[in-house]
From Swiss-Prot:
It is a multi-pass membrane protein. GO terms for cellular component: plasma membrane. The keyword Transport applies. The lineage of its organism: Bacteria, Pseudomonadati, Pseudomonadota, Gammaproteobacteria, Enterobacterales. Involved in pectinase, cellulase, and blue pigment regulation. SUPFAM superfamilies: Multidrug resistance efflux transporter EmrE (SSF103481). This is Protein PecM. It is found in: Cell membrane. Keywords: Cell membrane, Membrane, Repeat, Transmembrane, Transmembrane helix, Transport. InterPro entries: AA-Vitamin_Transporters, CO/AA/NH_transpt, EamA_dom. It comes from Dickeya dadantii (strain 3937).
Amino acid sequence: MKLKDFAFYAPCVWGTTYFVTTQFLPADKPLLAALIRALPAGIILILGKNLPPVGWLWRLFVLGALNIGVFFVMLFFAAYRLPGGVVALVGSLQPLIVILLSFLLLTQPVLKKQMVAAVAGGIGIVLLISLPKAPLNPAGLVASALATMSMASGLVLTKKWGRPAGMTMLTFTGWQLFCGGLVILPVQMLTEPLPDLVTLTNLAGYLYLAIPGSLLAYFMWFSGLEANSPVIMSLLGFLSPLVALLLGFLFLQQGLSGAQLVGVVFIFSALIIVQDISLFSRRKKVKPLEQSDCVIK
């Protein structure tokens, strides 16, 4: 098996974030967790490497901001103002946004199977979560929508732009994590004080988020994007709430209702369709993400 075949690793690991955050990290420090997920891993990966071409710096910053920096900041802003289920529901719209952007920016045709998978996954998310009866915070809804659009745009632009000639995937991942961390850093410093005490349990949680949850996850994610369309990758995101649900059931004594089990069936149906789309795309020989040979002035 090749790295591209492990694209599912990233959304599965990201599905553990809520469990790790609530069980291992200091309370009410989400931006610090986001910063530690991005900046240290990025520095490790680019340390000692050559600088990218000058014309690529702005592209790497845009990709890092969309895929990581803006996404994390908006996501945590929304999480403080909305129930987690609402954030997940808004996030389930991401595949539909990616389908539209792929059509507009990559001229990829819209397939019926893509739409069916996106709708099936969205229905599954609705069944997994419980929506509140109280009015929703408008600012939280806007932030959640911006987080969803940010990651969707980052996926499509990463596919469109590729990566600089001669740059390895690890280094490409590192630059995005580094640039994303630079976006998060001033927001964290201005809005969130550091914790008074950091325990060994906290350190273990931060280490997990930084290495398996970020460095390895984003490396696998971008490697998968080389061989698959952004639509397929966005549909794999439905794995995250499934993993979160499973961890809650196994370790947090959270029960499973009949509706949630039906939701699991819908999401698995969407993932089966994703596999079918992937096989179809490979037969059609969709051009993979390549290193860019263009000279940018």
